[in-house]
Amino acid sequence: MEYGYDEDWTFAGIHPDSYMSQDNYIRNRKTQSLELRFLSNESSRLFSNSTDWLFGVYTLNNDEGLRREYTYLTSDFYSDYTFDTAAAFFQLDSMLSEKLTLETGIRVERRDTTYQDSEMLSFSPSETLWGGRVAIKYLLNSNSMAYASIARGYKAGGFNTDGTLDADLREFDEEFLIEYELGVKSNLLDNTLHLKAALFHDDRNEQQVKSSTGRIRANGSTEFIDFIGNAAEGTNNGVEFEAVWYPSERLGLTASLGLLDATFDSFLNSKNQDLSGRDQAHAPGYMAHLAVDYNVGAWSIAGSLDAKDDFYFSDSHHVQSDPYELLNMRVSYSTERWSLSLWGRNLTDQDYAVRGFFFGEFGNDPRKGYAPEPYLQFGEPRIIGVTYEVQL
């Protein structure tokens, strides 16, 4: 895979103080994986035929080579990043009574990693990771079930392969979290109304965060570097609701709402800013979804409205998005062999930012003297299209 970009973002001659820089990456990746699963049947259940079981093993080998061609490097940068993973997992689902079920599971993983590059940097860490889950499910009645669970999850550590990043920022550590969840699921009104609700709390440790830093070179030009690092601790609290209702064979209605409070308990970012107590990046306070689907014979019409609260773009600065709503619709005509659809996304042509950058000490516009300013990447504008599908 090869990709690159124009680092100066401008065309030649735009300003007397402009600079020209190209950054190109050539990556080669080889991946091999194997997973085997063994499941119980009626004759192999455990504990007096009350417990189903699952056992599995998983292996993964990944080898990634990088060649970076960059204007400000005296020679091309090379790196090789390899990791081997071997894991085993086991799960038991036990019927403690007609209404009560206990689910337990565990996964243990061994990960061996090597990294070396053309600047003579090399790392070879190994780590043993584990995660698991314990859940209790209680059947309230024939249509409703409540559950409670506690789980431990993890993300393996890794490396930032950018050749110009400081050596002490190349490696990042494992993240793990403990999650507590309570929930209920119900099927009502002759199984035409499906309801879900959940409440969760996450304690995150050594949280992996996407950071960025910028540098001014000797000639006055700038360099921007994205990398992954570790925050100390974070806490996530949230509530989720979902309702799906089919009042008739032709009409379907869906509504969902998620509320989230995700903050850093303690975190000093790459610019030595204390973000303790601040919201984590890309963690909107609410997300909502409304949808309708109506069918009459071969015709169908569907519409949806999605809403998202404001959020921070990064853990390296304080630039935020604005709240926004997106309206989508589709009208279709279908036969057994073909279908024709007229559809539109973002029908109100809402301007909304999905990513934001702010480099603090400088900007990247020579016409403004490289004054610091935010740069925003917007989502797609109003798009209207026609889709024709046929089965041969």
Where does each model-flagged region fall?
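Gram-negative outer-membrane beta-barrel transporters
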Residues: 98, 102, 201-203, 227-315, ...
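Transmembrane beta-strands of outer-membrane beta-barrel pores
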Residues: 2-5, 59-63, 108-114, 150-156, ...
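Short loop/turn motifs that connect adjacent beta-strands in outer-membrane beta-barrel proteins
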Residues: 43-52, 99, 141-143, 188-192, ...
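C-terminal beta-signal and adjacent terminal beta-strands/loops
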Residues: 307-312, 332-392
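Membrane-embedded beta-barrel scaffold of Gram-negative outer-membrane proteins
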Residues: 1-13, 139, 145-151, 173-239, ...
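Transmembrane beta-strands of outer-membrane beta-barrel proteins
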Residues: 51-55, 102-106, 132, 146, ...
